[in-house]
Amino acid sequence: NAINEMIENGMQGVEFIAVNTDAQDLKHSKAKSKIQIGLNLTKGLGAGAKLDIGQAAADESLNEIVNVLQGANMVFITAGMGGGTGTGSAHVIARAAKELNILTVGVVTLPFLYEGPSRMRRATQGLEELRKHVDTIIVVPNQNLFKIASEQTTFEELSLIHISEP
């Protein structure tokens, strides 16, 4: 998780807020602030790669999201595009931040090609929606990780490269 990596690296002057539909994922987050979105909708489970569930979960928890955003000068929204929660909720959170006149930056990843065309279509759809609500966006295609990996790099090592790359 990118948030855990930034916390472990001692990033200062930042308040980290983990947002997820999945209760188990939130338990592993080192962020001091955590928001489990869509509790009534998902019952603490993930969004099942359904971006409409991710969006509905964020909508359900919008008041809580707005409360933690208030007072911020700048918000970075990090998400992996292509699944349900990040893809569906990122633009809802970004829209809320923009409505509060907060400078909003998206930092997202696109799926590996081997993850298939349907995941890439969801990612593209989520990315297009997110672009409407951020001041700027940084998009990192996961496929680019192969440029810095060797044939001997394991999937676990590749995941660590992914997390620790700026």
Placement of each model-derived feature along the sequence:
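Tubulin/FtsZ superfamily GTPase core signature
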Residues: 1-166
